[in-house]
């Protein structure tokens, strides 16, 4: 099962990816992890990427696609894989096709922007333990204090409303077009066309998980 998971930041993709990978016995492939591993291993592509990153540049699609091609050829991908955070752009999706890497299904987790903002901007964290609360959905017993230690809770920079809205803006501009790209391809059909599965991500994690797994197993 070769899969792509789409959805805005905060939609719960990481949680669902773990469930999918466990159910199908496939690895979760993150471009960030892949880059770090290639740099650490000192591969030719890793050395190119390190030079660019050291200079503060963005690693090109050609290098990313080269790393993807190497990664999916490894033994643990024999039964498939799940791409996490890839492709991010139409150009990367086209590159994947050009390499002949076939995708069986694309799963889109749908969550409205305002729900994402509420989820993320309401998070509060205890720095010492990593315990996470939510001002509405999972509040601490005493406002702003950790239940166990009584120490102050903080809002992470990534969870501030302006940061969340900026990330959503980037998603809609760069990654959201992939929804049209893959859903239209699935509608047209053809031998290589992936299935396109949409799920409502506003429901409980277990409900979303069960619906995704049922849809994938029904293929």
UniProtKB/Swiss-Prot annotation:
Basic and acidic residues bias spans: 140-150
Main location: cytoplasm
Chain intervals for the UniProt region annotation (NMP): 30-59
Subcellular location(s) of the protein: Cytoplasm
InterPro entries in UniProt: Adenyl_kin_sub, Adenylat/UMP-CMP_kin, Adenylat_kinase_CS, Adenylate_kinase_lid-dom, P-loop_NTPase
An example Gene Ontology biological process: AMP salvage
Catalytic activity: AMP + ATP = 2 ADP
Pathway stated in the Swiss-Prot or TrEMBL entry: Purine metabolism; AMP biosynthesis via salvage pathway; AMP from ADP: step 1/1
Positions with a binding annotation for AMP: 31, 36, 57-59, 85-88, 92, 156, 167
GO MF assignments: adenylate kinase activity; ATP binding
Renumbered residue ranges of the record's region Disordered: 128-150
Keywords: ATP-binding, Cytoplasm, Kinase, Nucleotide biosynthesis, Nucleotide-binding, Transferase
LID as annotated region, ranges: 122-159
Short name of any one Pfam family annotated for the protein: ADK
Entry EC no(s): 2.7.4.3
Group of enzyme by EC: transferase
Cellular component terms per the entry's GO annotation: cytoplasm
CDD domains (UniProt xref): ADK
Annotated ATP binding sites: 10-15, 123, 132-133, 203
Function: Catalyzes the reversible transfer of the terminal phosphate group between ATP and AMP. Plays an important role in cellular energy homeostasis and in adenine nucleotide metabolism.
Family assignment from sequence similarity: Belongs to the adenylate kinase family.
PANTHER family for this protein: NUCLEOTIDE KINASE
Domain comment quoted from the record: Consists of three domains, a large central CORE domain and two small peripheral domains, NMPbind and LID, which undergo movements during catalysis. The LID domain closes over the site of phosphoryl transfer upon ATP binding. Assembling and dissambling the active center during each catalytic cycle provides an effective means to prevent ATP hydrolysis.
NCBIfam families: adk, PRK00279.1-1, PRK00279.1-2, PRK00279.1-3, PRK14527.1
Protein name: Adenylate kinase
Organism: Halorhodospira halophila (strain DSM 244 / SL1)
The encoding gene: adk
């Amino acid at each position: 099962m070769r899969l792509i998971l789409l959805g805005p930041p905060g939609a719960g993709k990481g949680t669902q990816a773990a469930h999918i990978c466990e159910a199908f016995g496939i690895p979760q492939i993150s471009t960030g992890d892949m880059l770090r591993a290639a740099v650490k291993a000192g591969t030719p592509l890793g050395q190119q990427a390190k030079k660019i990153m050291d200079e503060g540049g963005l690693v090109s699609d050609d290098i990313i696609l080269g790393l993807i091609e190497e990664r999916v050829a490894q033994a643990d991908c024999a039964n498939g894989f799940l791409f996490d955070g890839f492709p991010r752009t139409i150009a990367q999706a086209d590159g994947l096709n050009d390499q002949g890497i076939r995708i069986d299904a694309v799963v889109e987790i749908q969550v409205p922007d305002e729900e994402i903002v509420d989820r993320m901007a309401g998070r509060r964290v205890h720095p010492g333990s990593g315990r996470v609360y939510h001002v509405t959905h999972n509040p601490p017993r005493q406002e702003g204090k950790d239940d166990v230690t009584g120490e102050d809770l903080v809002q992470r920079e990534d969870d501030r409303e302006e940061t969340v809205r900026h990330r959503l803006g980037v998603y809609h501009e760069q990654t959201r077009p992939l929804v049209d790209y893959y859903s239209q391809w699935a509608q047209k059909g053809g031998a290589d066309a992936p299935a396109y599965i949409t799920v409502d991500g506003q429901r409980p994690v277990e409900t979303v998980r069960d619906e995704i797994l049922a849809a994938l197993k029904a293929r």
